[in-house]
């Protein structure tokens, strides 16, 4: 089950049922099944608090993924700062909705085992994001 909640922000005008079906399809293409995935859409202050408290990082970010997956069943809590998504969209000169979909997919891709921290991993993640967006 995939759920979306908000904290300190309004829910974006997105078709949640379509997004959920899309994320399930993305998982299946990577040989995974969806367990409990909770998205919390929040503001910069909340994501900074989470980043400090749980990861000991003192900076803003667009997404934090806590992975509780087991074998081929993906599960986790995914925090997304809508403030950072908006500023990234402006900086990258892409639409807000497009950037939000990219970040939403990014979280599921992390749960599917794709990382973006090591050498060459960022390119792998970007390719996976692009493939996921094609499915949408």
Q: Can you describe what each PLM-predicted range is?
A:
Residues 1-101, 112-136:
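An acidic/histidine-cluster motif and surrounding catalytic segment
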Residues 109:
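Conserved ATP-binding N-box helix of the HATPase_c
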């Amino acid at each position: 089950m995939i759920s979306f909640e908000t904290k300190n922000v309004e829910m974006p005008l997105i078709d949640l049922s379509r997004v959920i079906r899309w994320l399930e399809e993305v998982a299946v293409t990577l040989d995974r099944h969806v367990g409990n995935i909770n998205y919390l859409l929040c503001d910069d202050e909340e994501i900074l608090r989470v980043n400090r408290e749980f990861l000991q990082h003192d900076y803003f970010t667009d997404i934090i993924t806590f992975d509780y997956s087991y074998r081929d069943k993906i599960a986790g809590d995914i925090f997304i700062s809508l403030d950072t998504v908006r500023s990234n969209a402006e900086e990258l000169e892409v639409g807000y909705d497009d950037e939000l979909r990219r970040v939403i997919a990014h979280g599921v891709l992390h749960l599917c085992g794709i990382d973006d921290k090591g050498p060459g991993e960022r390119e792998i993640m970007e390719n996976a994001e692009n493939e996921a967006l094609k499915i949408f």
